[in-house]
Every structure is written in structure tokens, then in C-alpha cells.
A protein has these predicted regions:
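Glycan-processing catalytic domains of CAZymes
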Residues: 34-414
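Sec-dependent N-terminal signal peptides of Gram-negative exported proteins
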Residues: 13-25
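N-terminal secretory signal peptides and thylakoid transit peptides that target proteins
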Residues: 1-16
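C-terminal segment of N-terminal export signals and the immediately downstream linker at the start
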Residues: 22-39
Length: 414
């Protein structure tokens, strides 16, 4: 990346993080100092070294859901992909009092430790899901630091799916976790959905400042659980990456949206079949790979999947979706690197700047642009790729520096 473009990225990132009135030069000096003290990264993520995450879910204090084992999960990952893979440890049923909501309890900490002990023994790289569903009382940041000090296989922490229950403790706590991850060379990966949600997150001073300090430790990623706003979510996350908020972006492909569409067979008319649990396990395997293509084509480097009994394995047996869609496309991304940030910046012909209002205030903006049904994320990247959405905190000079020659659209554009 040339010096002018690099400076524009830094300026944009600092603009987003600059809630306090601190001079740009001082912020740049502080960031440079923090960067020089960062630990060696535990996982390398880039367009030439993407990351494939595969999830296992907690069942009892010492077991996993769906008959899986940690050893079996790692064995299911092909040897040529293992250097680019890690296992997501999701506590799921271990969470009390509500499944999948990781409130800090002795049982939760014991499960984390049990799984980390096993991962260390078997030398399996893992990420801990420590935030989800708006839970405020998660494990303390310093507890996470202790695990980094104890377990070399711990690669980072994850925050997953809070869009339906936002509260301002989420970004405040996430900032603390991001700082710990940066201290130990880990990644903090945050999967979530909808433009408004990410706007709220970046309006939180603690998180915006942490993101500005530690962009290389932060992965911002989509999570397309509901049947709405896939294109605008891709746009805002892509725009955050292009303006330097995070060094990598990605997605969690969620077949739950198939359930929300009432589908139980490929392309059955909506509503013709019962809305039951068969739905999430019947999204066509190839469509999962198509979703990966959208991420890849727009510079994404982190691939994750919900509904793991369908997208990864059960009873220690890899699923057809994993073997026939996810693995083949991930191999393709290894052999044919996704476009770099420099590549995406250079090819971008237009951006949407939220100076005059958010893109979500324009009903049906995307309808007919890249898709005819925004409830399914198969057409988010059209002929002109994803349209980056730039937060209003980034000034016009920074945008022009990043995207020379690109049209800058706003809500009031003719």
C-alpha cells in the first residue's frame, strides 16, 4: 500500500476512535507506541493465510453436544487445512441459567478450563466464546489473561450474536477483552448483524478507542442469522475494514435463516411446509459455499459457521456440508488469495457515507442493485462488489484519500 493510502487508512481509523478531542498527531504517536509493544501474534490471518473456524458446543461439564469430542473435531479437519484452522469452543448447554448465554458461573469456568486442558494436551488451537446474547456478567478480562498465560493453544476470544439484545456493556466489556487479546497476541473476533448495531458499538468510546489501538487484533464479522439486512451488514462491516477499524473481516454463515424462511426443501415456496427444526439442516450445501464466496470476493479472511451439527460434524463424523462445500471452497481461497485491502480500495467505484443519515433509512436501497431478496445473503456482492458503507465519523478528506476517484453517495444524493 502506498504511503498516501496508508495514511488515509490510519486517519479514517483514528476518526472513528476519536470520541475524545485528542490531536491526530498525538493519537498516531500513542498508537505507534502501543503497536511496537504488541506481543507476537498467535495466529496469522491475512488474504494469504485465511482462518477457518469450526465450532463444538458444550453439553455437560466434561462433554460436547451432538456426540462430538474435541479430538474427533480436530481429526475431521484435513491435514492441509490444519495450519489455517482452529476450533471454536462454545459453552452452549453448560451456560446457566440459560443455554448459550455465557454468564460467568463456576460451572462455565470449569468447562472452559476442562476444554483448554484437553486442547493443550492434544495441541489443538482454540478460540473461546465468552460473549453472546447481550450477557453483561461474563468472565472478567483478567481471568481471560490468566488463560492466555497458561495455554499456548488459546488463540483468542469471541463475541457472537447480540444484535437482538444490545446494551452498552457489550462494547465496554469487549474493549477490555480486546486489550487482553492484544497483550497476548490473540485475536478478538466479533460476529454480529445489522448496520444500526455496529453504529452503536462504534459510538462506545471505550471500544472505539480500543479498536483504534489494536486493529490487528480485531476481527469484525457478520452473522446472518435473521432474514433481513444482509447486504447492509456486509456493507458496514466491509466499510469498517476498509477504513482501518480492523485488520481482517469475515462472516459466520448461519443456516438458521433457512428456518426463518420456513424452508425445509431447497426453494420450496415460503410457508408451504412446517416451520420446524428440519429447516436449518436443509439449506443447500452449495449455498453455504456461495456465501463464503461473497466474503472472499470482498476481501474477507475469516470463515465461521453456525448450526455446527449441520455445517461441521456430529458424533465425530464430518457432515456433507463441511466436506463438500466448506472445505473445497476454503482450499480454493488458500490457492487463490482473496483480494487485499489495497486491491479492494483501488477497485471501489462508489461508497455510501452516512453523513446525512444511515443507509438503513433508505427502504429497499439494495433491492434490484445486487439482489431481489435481501433476506438471503446470496447476492450481496454483485457486478460492482459490496458497496462499502462509511460511518459519519470519518471525514470527507479521509474518504477521498482512501477511495480516490470513487463517487461518495449520501442519503441526500440525487
Amino acid at each position: 500500500m502506498d504511503i498516501t493510502r496508508r495514511q488515509a487508512v490510519k486517519s479514517a481509523a483514528f476518526a472513528i476512535g476519536a470520541v475524545a478531542a485528542v490531536p491526530v498527531a498525538a493519537r498516531a504517536q500513542d498508537a505507534a507506541g502501543a503497536s511496537s509493544q504488541d506481543a507476537v501474534m498467535r495466529t496469522r490471518i491475512s488474504n494469504t493465510s485465511p482462518l477457518l473456524l469450526s465450532a463444538v458446543y458444550g453439553n455437560t461439564p466434561d462433554s460436547l453436544w451432538w456426540g462430538n469430542t474435541l479430538e474427533g473435531a480436530w481429526s475431521a479437519v484435513p491435514d492441509d487445512i490444519k495450519p489455517y484452522a482452529a476450533i471454536e469452543l462454545h459453552p452452549a448447554k453448560v451456560c446457566k441459567p440459560t443455554s448459550c448465554i455465557p454468564k460467568d458461573t463456576p460451572e462455565l469456568r470449569a468447562w472452559y478450563k476442562h476444554m483448554l486442558d484437553e486442547a493443550q494436551l492434544l495441541d489443538i488451537p482454540v478460540f473461546l466464546v465468552i460473549m453472546s446474547a447481550g450477557e453483561r456478567q461474563t468472565v472478567p478480562a483478567e481471568w481471560l489473561a490468566e488463560q492466555f498465560e497458561t495455554y499456548s493453544v488459546l488463540r483468542g476470544a469471541m463475541n457472537i450474536e447480540n444484535y437482538w439484545i444490545y446494551n452498552d456493556d457489550l462494547p465496554t466489556n469487549a474493549a477490555k477483552y480486546l486489550e487482553v487479546c492484544a497483550r497476548y497476541g490473540g485475536h478478538f473476533i466479533w460476529h454480529d448483524h445489522e448496520n444500526w448495531f455496529w453504529q452503536r458499538v462504534m459510538s462506545n468510546k471505550a471500544f472505539a478507542d480500543a479498536a483504534a489501538k489494536y486493529p490487528k487484533n480485531l476481527v469484525i464479522a457478520t452473522k446472518n442469522t435473521p432474514i433481513r439486512d444482509d447486504a447492509s451488514t456486509d456493507s458496514i462491516v466491509n466499510g469498517m475494514w476498509l477504513t482501518g477499524v480492523c485488520e481482517n473481516w469475515g462472516a459466520s454463515m448461519d443456516t438458521w435463516k433457512w428456518w426463518e424462511k420456513h424452508f425445509t426443501k431447497p426453494f420450496d415456496a415460503v410457508g408451504t411446509r412446517p416451520r420446524d427444526m428440519r429447516s436449518y439442516a436443509s439449506e443447500s450445501e452449495a449455498m453455504i459455499a456461495c456465501e463464503m464466496m461473497n466474503v472472499y470476493a470482498n476481501g474477507g479472511t475469516v470463515y465461521n459457521f453456525e448450526c455446527a451439527a449441520y455445517t461441521f460434524m456430529d458424533n465425530d463424523v464430518a457432515t456433507p456440508a463441511y466436506l463438500n462445500a466448506i472445505v473445497p471452497f476454503f482450499r480454493f481461497s488458500l490457492n487463490n488469495p482473496a483480494p487485499s485491502r489495497k486491491d479492494v480500495l483501488a477497485r471501489t467505484k462508489a461508497v455510501f457515507w452516512e453523513k446525512d443519515g444511515g443507509i438503513d433509512s433508505l427502504p429497499n436501497f439494495y433491492k434490484g442493485l445486487s439482489m431481489d431478496d435481501e433476506s438471503l445473503p446470496l447476492y450481496d456482492s454483485g457486478r460492482y462488489h459490496a458497496l462499502p458503507v462509511i460511518m459519519n465519523r470519518v471525514d470527507e478528506a479521509a474518504i477521498k484519500g482512501l477511495f480516490p476517484g470513487a463517487a461518495i453517495l449520501t442519503k441526500n444524493s440525487s
